[in-house]
Amino acid sequence: MASQGTKRSYEQMETDGERQNATEIRASVGKMISGIGRFYIQMCTELKLSDYEGRLIQNSLTIERMVLSAFDERRNKYLEEHPSAGKDPKKTGGPIYKRVDGKWMRELILYDKEEIRRIWRQANNGDDATAGLTHMMIWHSNLNDATYQRTRALVRTGMDPRMCSLMQGSTLPRRSGAAGAAVKGIGTMVMELIRMIKRGINDRNFWRGENGRKTRIAYERMCNILKGKFQTAAQRAMMDQVRESRNPGNAEFEDLTFLARSALILRGSVAHKSCLPACVYGPAVASGYDFEREGYSLVGIDPFKLLQNSQVYSLIRPNENPAHKSQLVWMACHSAAFEDLRVSSFIRGTKVIPRGKLSTRGVQIASNENMETMGSSTLELRSRYWAIRTRSGGNTNQQRASAGQISIQPTFSVQRNLPFDRTTIMAAFTGNTEGRTSDMRTEIIRMMESARPEDVSFQGRGVFELSDEKATNPIVPSFDMSNEGSYFFGDNAEEYDN
């Protein structure tokens, strides 16, 4: 990318660091991971969980959610000012599952947020350790990305539901900082901006006064984040137009939806990180592994190695397939919801199938579900190979932008073609090329038309054996070029809607 020099690496964002060398980054990411691990061990002690119960992913999610809620300052402030019946703003909790007499029981727990904050800080040498909190947010976001298809949200903001591959990180909270911004897809950023523009159209005071000034700063900051994700000059120039608009309205809305569509072929750079549940880090720390001393990276072999020797369990509903549940969590762990299934299958070493064919619902269990019939099983999260996570979008060098199937945002840096259905995508680009962005639009459409689905991306990049820690011998897989593999293709996954 052109602006490489000005960007901090994702690990630096992850750890709020200034410029650091590779060893320092590995150490500070390791420090963040061991903090999460220590916190998790302490919480399992507090809750008197057995080893098995502590490795249950549903318990992990509840504990993670509690600490995120305890540190959600804006929401905590709001809850104190707007008390609602039956909700104590100072407490947080959720369902904890325990094994009693051969059956799984649900127990609702409640803790003081202050107490949770104390335990978290204690596990992190007295720091607030925001990086660790963000890490857990990204894990939850990756799990949502693999579990739900955001068609309704796309339609609501006037975008095409087939653009779901652009929606990575769409459920990340606003407070997820630079590390969160790095993993957001083009569609997610566009959707956030469109929501602001719509509010501005409906509420004339939105951009006015002291509050309006803050709103404006937020708007421009989001525009700059989105601009930084685009890799072609024309797309970036259009973002400048959107950002500089005196009074954002319909023209900006049009430009943004145009840009979102263009990203299906001229893909943006979106970071991918393997963020694992706390119940993986806890036992690793407990077994004496020193993450800070050994160093850790979210984009290399480390998460793969960690998952190779971790035991994680999950509750299973009566008609769910444990192997399918495992696939869902594996994809979430590697942030691979929008990766080509051919690539994921090769790395995992077992066939990864589309969401619509999975006999499994989400990982979370609703409070009204019957526990009587609930079983549990081991999640198979191991892989056959490992590969480096990418943040490039996989555009080939000739055009700085290549073909992208209507549903892929690559996760792994592995050579393949990125197949896409040009007719479907180009059909969306009829007509409107007039107005102040006409020359940029024309240029973008020209680039899209010259993109070929058979172009090879990530030339020469391959996967590695798990014994090849230094990534010395890339194995370049050969894929059936004609066969696209998108996860949400023609699908009926549940909606993510709160």
UniProtKB/Swiss-Prot annotation:
Disulfide bond entries: none
Localization annotation: Virion; Host nucleus
BP GO terms, sorted: symbiont entry into host cell; viral penetration into host nucleus
The keyword Nucleotide-binding is assigned to this record: no
Basic and acidic residues composition bias: residue spans: 8-21
Motif range (Unconventional nuclear localization signal): 1-18
GO cellular component: helical viral capsid; host cell; host cell nucleus; ribonucleoprotein complex; viral nucleocapsid
Tree of life domain: Viruses
Keywords: Capsid protein, Helical capsid protein, Host nucleus, Host-virus interaction, Ribonucleoprotein, RNA-binding, Viral nucleoprotein, Viral penetration into host nucleus, Virion, Virus entry into host cell
Record GO terms (molecular function): RNA binding; structural molecule activity
RNA-binding recorded as keyword: yes
Motif Bipartite nuclear localization signal: where in chain: 198-216
Major location (coarse): virion
Cross-referenced InterPro entries: Flu_NP
Region annotation Disordered: where it falls in the sequence: 1-21
PTM summary: Late in virus-infected cells, may be cleaved from a 56-kDa protein to a 53-kDa protein by a cellular caspase. This cleavage might be a marker for the onset of apoptosis in infected cells or have a specific function in virus host interaction.
Function recorded in the entry: Encapsidates the negative strand viral RNA, protecting it from nucleases. The encapsidated genomic RNA is termed the ribonucleoprotein (RNP) and serves as template for transcription and replication. The RNP needs to be localized in the host nucleus to start an infectious cycle, but is too large to diffuse through the nuclear pore complex. NP comprises at least 2 nuclear localization signals that are responsible for the active RNP import into the nucleus through cellular importin alpha/beta pathway.
The family this protein is said to belong to: Belongs to the influenza viruses nucleoprotein family.
Complex and partners: Homomultimerizes to form the nucleocapsid. May bind host exportin-1/XPO1. Binds to viral genomic RNA. Protein-RNA contacts are mediated by a combination of electrostatic interactions between positively charged residues and the phosphate backbone and planar interactions between aromatic side chains and bases.
Protein name: Nucleoprotein
Species name: Influenza A virus (strain A/USA:Huston/AA/1945 H1N1)
